[in-house]
Amino acid sequence: MKAICDRFVPSKCSSSSTSEKRDISSPTSLVSDSASSDNKSNLTLCSDVVASSSPVSQLCREASTSGHNPVCTTHSSWTVILKTASMASGAIRRFQDRVLGPSRTGISSSTSEIWLLGVCYKISEGESSEEADAGRVLAAFRQDFSSLILMTYRRGFEPIGDTTYTSDVNWGCMLRSGQMLFAQALLFQRLGRSWRKKDSEPADEKYLEILELFGDTEASAFSIHNLILAGESYGLAAGSWVGPYAVCRSWESLARKNKEETDDKHKSFSMAVHIVSGSEDGERGGAPILCIEDVTKTCLEFSEGETEWPPILLLVPLVLGLDRVNPRYIPSLIATFTFPQSLGILGGKPGASTYIVGVQEDKGFYLDPHDVQQVVTVKKENQDVDTSSYHCNTLRYVPLESLDPSLALGFYCQHKDDFDDFCIRATKLAGDSNGAPLFTVTQSHRRNDCGIAETSSSTETSTEISGEEHEDDWQLL
């Protein structure tokens, strides 16, 4: 992923870095931000580009090695820096416009309901009391959105493995998107869906513990360092970009490793992880199949034979078209956000991953991992730590029709009844998909007389929609 300078607008997602401090005191932005930004913002967001590639940085290095004062401290050299940064900013702005499209922020004037990870915010249009109610609804939505955990590019962390990478700028956006989804699952499990971050109160220890798990160090269970190590067999490597399927499998491996290598008292991720795909290697065409027997087996293995059904995270990697998502699938994608179990979508534009957390009509609200922030050390014992860089107050959205077709859905089921409810909803969604299901639900696998694996659908509707008539837009994962 290329670092995106002038990312949409000067971000309101705060950072602990003094040079990148953003405004977090204002309420969530509901108006379009200006498409332009001042030179200071350009320099801040482009610092990595300038530092690594500009002739000025080379001049600084040469001066430093020769024992002279760095020439970039002179007035004329600062002028060169400004010009270089401006050129880099313009180039990356044009790149950003091509990849992600022009800046889109805030909420439209539409009164259509908003769905945010399974929670509905109904906006009514009217006078007096109805307008006041709409204001309260929007305020509640803003608070919910800004309480979601944000993961972005970081710089200044310890090298990843045997490499020299101390930053994931330019390539780590899909990994950060995956971190956001997993962090959200932990937040729902440990604090509940109704939890909201309150700046006026000391930070909750469970909340800080979650952030600590995603610190940028090998000591943190779900750091980018450990995710890359767990995903080596799926192509994960520092400096390389991977797709949603590889990231889903890597998280599955990391969660399994965490369970195997730690005792019950110190387990960081106390939920099972199950990947829903067409086959074990994810290379079967057609809609993926959620087999209830397989999920039950995953839960039994995780609980080591105990009868109590553990919480489970379901990940569904998909490829829904060629260059962009086929419009037939968009209604179903929108509907998944109405599920109480919804954890959103890992996806975005081609080559630019984001974490989509909500929908209104045909657009998706998302958290953007492309802002570059300094590393922050969070410890659960320190309730005074500044965690503002893990949250965002700026609402950004993308037209769902422009999404890259390679994406992944996430769902969190707290217990067996929750999973059963999810299966009912998913089966109905497949039945209402007009022959274009995102995935189907079956009760068990069976083999025919020729030894070929088949599936036994949990409902008649599921059987009817699992044929090949409408599978022409699917790709191999």
Curated annotation (Swiss-Prot):
Swiss-Prot/TrEMBL keywords: Autophagy, Cytoplasm, Hydrolase, Protease, Protein transport, Thiol protease, Transport, Ubl conjugation pathway
Catalytic activity: [protein]-C-terminal L-amino acid-glycyl-phosphatidylethanolamide + H2O = [protein]-C-terminal L-amino acid-glycine + a 1,2-diacyl-sn-glycero-3-phosphoethanolamine
Disulfide bridge partners, by residue number: none
EC number: 3.4.22.-
Biased composition (Polar residues): 25-39
Positions with biased composition (Low complexity): 454-465
Tissue: Constitutively expressed.
GO molecular function, one term: cysteine-type peptidase activity
Active site: C173 (nucleophile), D368, H370
UniProt region (Disordered), positions on chain: 11-39, 453-477
Localization in the cell: Cytoplasm
Gene Ontology BP terms: autophagy; protein transport; proteolysis
Enzyme class, spelled out: hydrolase
A single cellular component GO annotation: cytoplasm
Assembly information from the UniProt record: Interacts with ATG8a and ATG8d.
Protein function: Cysteine protease that plays a key role in autophagy by mediating both proteolytic activation and delipidation of ATG8 family proteins. The protease activity is required for proteolytic activation of ATG8 family proteins: cleaves the C-terminal amino acid of ATG8 proteins to reveal a C-terminal glycine. Exposure of the glycine at the C-terminus is essential for ATG8 proteins conjugation to phosphatidylethanolamine (PE) and insertion to membranes, which is necessary for autophagy. In addition to the protease activity, also mediates delipidation of PE-conjugated ATG8 proteins.
Family the UniProt entry places it in: Belongs to the peptidase C54 family.
Name of the protein this chain belongs to: Cysteine protease ATG4b
